From Swiss-Prot:
Record key words, sorted: Transferase, tRNA processing
HAMAP family tied to this protein: tRNA_carboxymethyltr_CmoB
GO MF annotation list: methyltransferase activity; transferase activity, transferring alkyl or aryl (other than methyl) groups
Main function: Catalyzes carboxymethyl transfer from carboxy-S-adenosyl-L-methionine (Cx-SAM) to 5-hydroxyuridine (ho5U) to form 5-carboxymethoxyuridine (cmo5U) at position 34 in tRNAs.
Protein name according to UniProt: tRNA U34 carboxymethyltransferase
Protein source organism: Vibrio vulnificus (strain CMCP6)
Residues the entry annotates as binding carboxy-S-adenosyl-L-methionine: 91, 105, 110, 130, 152-154, 181-182, 196, 200, 315
Entries under CDD domains matching the protein: AdoMet_MTases (cd02440)
Family: Belongs to the class I-like SAM-binding methyltransferase superfamily. CmoB family.
EC code: 2.5.1.-
NCBIfam families: PRK15068.1 (NF011650), tRNA 5-methoxyuridine(34)/uridine 5-oxyacetic acid(34) synthase CmoB (TIGR00452)
Taxonomic lineage of the native organism: Bacteria, Pseudomonadati, Pseudomonadota, Gammaproteobacteria, Vibrionales
The reaction(s) this protein catalyses: carboxy-S-adenosyl-L-methionine + 5-hydroxyuridine(34) in tRNA = 5-carboxymethoxyuridine(34) in tRNA + S-adenosyl-L-homocysteine + H(+)
């Protein structure tokens, strides 16, 4: 069983986040009571991971944990075996006492594209919607964020996050909650909200943008990253059934159309700050994620298209302000 008591105590002392306590404990109790087949096995492995503050932590330039006195070879092999229990590792990379967790995604590349365009995170409270295993939350703390709260309903992502946190010495500035955005009340409590790689999974994208706005304080900043297509402000792709073998994907606007959508729901100062075609070096199969990946989802004869014939994945980053 997971104990979220530390997070409850934390938000009880924050006047903006206190109202969350009206619903959050029951939501997390309901989550605990819902069974997941692999969860007991993962939890058993998590409990075996050593806890203790490492001598060196770098979350500014990477996510790297090390000791001045290296682990013995036997200890390293045991730790690597435990971490591999949590396969597949999709978001990263991490370097843990010399063990390089080579994840499917080079999430550090995305962070390098995002960081130059956002307001400094120093002393800000941050919400990361669809945070995966929390890689970007560690990087946000590396930029001086006061508090990072991530939400993602995946059991495995929570376990991976807690494994890294345990190896970091139990840092309480970052917390991952196994929830979806639709379960959050209108908190208006965060200085910065990130939604990266989520919008195209939402049946109602405008509602998602409103939900994000509802979490921001007045004057707060939204960083939105999603799959887009090329085109003017009227261009939107609605894939039939699958896109790059993904199910449950719905709306792929152009970056210019997405800017209009953000303005439509009340955001100001909307900027398109980056547009980038995803390369097969950024998303690929590794020995920490051995399933199919982007190279398998592109047309072998024309990599500018997916196997379904749609334009290959193109991602945009937009930054906007809540009035």
């Amino acid at each position: 069983m997971f104990n979220f008591a530390n997070f409850y105590q934390l938000i009880a002392q924050d006047t903006r986040l206190q109202p969350w306590l009206n619903v959050l404990p029951q939501q997390l109790t309901d989550w605990q009571n819902a069974e997941h087949g692999d969860f007991p096995r993962w939890l058993k492995a998590l409990n075996k991971i050593p806890e203790g503050a490492p001598d060196q932590i770098d979350i500014k330039h990477s996510v790297t944990i090390s000791n001045d006195t290296p682990f013995h070879q036997g200890e390293l092999k045991k730790l690597e075996s435990l971490l591999r229990t949590f396969h597949p590792w999709r978001k990263g990379p991490y370097t843990v006492h010399g063990i390089h967790i080579d994840t499917e995604w080079r999430s550090d590349w995305k962070w390098d594209r995002v960081l130059p365009h956002i307001s400094p995170l120093k002393n800000r409270s941050v919400l990361d919607v669809g945070c995966g295993n929390g890689y970007h939350m560690w990087r946000m703390l590396g930029e001086g964020a006061r508090l990072c709260v991530g939400i993602d309903p995946s059991h495995l992502f929570l376990i991976q996050f807690e494994a890294i946190r345990k190896l970091m010495g139990g840092d309480q500035r970052a917390h991952l909650l196994p929830l979806g955005i639709e379960q959050l009340p209108k908190l208006e409590a965060f200085d910065t909200v990130f939604s990266m790689g989520v919008l195209y999974h939402r049946r109602s994208p405008l509602d998602h943008l409103i939900q994000l706005k509802d979490q921001l304080v007045s004057g707060g900043e939204l960083i939105l990253e999603t799959l887009v297509i090329e085109g003017d402000e009227t261009a939107v792709l609605v894939p039939k059934e699958r896109y790059a073998q993904m199910r449950n994907v719905y709306f792929f606007p152009s970056a210019r159309a997405l800017k209009v959508w953000l303005e439509l729901v009340g955001f100001e100062d909307v900027r398109i700050v980056d547009e980038n075609v995803t390369s097969v070096d950024e998303q690929r199969t590794t020995n920490w994620m051995t399933h199919n990946s982007l190279p398998d989802y592109l047309d072998q004869n024309d990599p500018s298209k997916t196997v379904e014939g749609y334009p290959a994945p193109r991602r945009a980053i937009l930054v906007a302000k809540k009035p």
